[in-house]
Amino acid sequence: MHDDFLNPQTTLSRRHALALLAAPLAAAPALGVAAALPQITLAGPPAIVSAPLIHMAETGALKDAAQRTVFTAWRDPDQLRMMAMGGKADVLAMPSNVAANLFNRGAGVTLLNISTWGALWIVTRDAQRKTLADFKGEEIAVPFRGDMPDIVLQLLLTKQGLDPLRDFRIRYVPTPMEAMQLLITRRVSHALLSEPAVSLALRKTRSFPVGLIAPELHRGADLQQEWGRLYQRAPRVPQAGIAAVGAVRAQPQVLAAVARAYARSLAWCRDNALECGRMMSRHIDLLTPEAVADAIAVSLMDAVPAPQAREELEFFFGQLMARNPGLLGGKLPAAAFYGQS
């Protein structure tokens, strides 16, 4: 195991964030009849998992549960942790491992669903590179060191006997958009991206005037297919979903309404991809409606309730535990994490 698998800088930020743990928990009321909330704040990253949340906010999908619904974006996992622990949002889209880690460290987190099962690709200038092994010896730009999607990449590399540090030159960058910019400006030839950054990169390099100077880009290794091949499982990874934090967890009617609305909004986004893209582009800088529509077409999205996703999550978590238990807070999350008794 490499110490680099867990970013010391990120770990420090997590510890700093844990100082805020008591706030949302102290504010949580005892279980009882839920009154209509004045506001529900939804939050998510510039990724496809946020599309249903944005639709929910724009269409008033939770009007029976709250007087107002708003969406706010988080830019990186450290900001996500601070928002979750500081009471800055009620329902957040987040990587599955982050949700489990927060729960195991005592944060008030209830996973509602896993909805993103396939959104990770290596984007490359070389159309002939189709598996991770094809990138041996190459430099790859990777966002969010020690977090999703870096942890999936490292699992898949080590599973096939490759050393992430010796066999590759991993260039860590703060965000997926920065990895994409390195690709477009020819400063790297390969980058690990999630949707819709993948589709955005492919569209940008084919558009005027960027296309005059940018390289031709291709979808290279499909990390979902690599997962299925290496682990002899379905080619899907429980990458991200939505979780409730703080006081709203004590209102089961609200949680049920959120889960139902998310599933309906996801179905709407699949059926109305371009309009969904227009909604996302209004809330998240750099995204275009067309790139979001492309991303919806290729991503594996399925709003699986947390209890039904538990088996696949625990397999994924087991691989992370074997690699670095600290990624999950040292143990598998208990049944309460999944909203079970």
Show which residues each predicted segment covers:
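Solvent-exposed, polar/charged alpha-helical surfaces in well-ordered, non-transmembrane soluble domains
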Residues: 51, 82, 86, 100, ...
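Pocket-lining segment of extracytoplasmic ligand-binding domains
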Residues: 97-98, 177-279
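Secondary-structure end/capping motifs
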Residues: 247-323
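Short, solvent-exposed loop/beta-turn-alpha elements that line the ligand-binding surface or hinge
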Residues: 63-65, 227-232, 302-309
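Structured segments of extracytoplasmic/periplasmic soluble domains
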Residues: 56-59, 83, 138, 156-160, ...
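Conserved C-terminal helix/tail region of periplasmic/extracytoplasmic solute-binding proteins
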Residues: 314, 318-341
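Short, glycine-/small- and polar/acidic-enriched structural segments
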Residues: 35-173, 189-195, 214-220
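N-terminal secretory signal peptides
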Residues: 1-12, 23-27
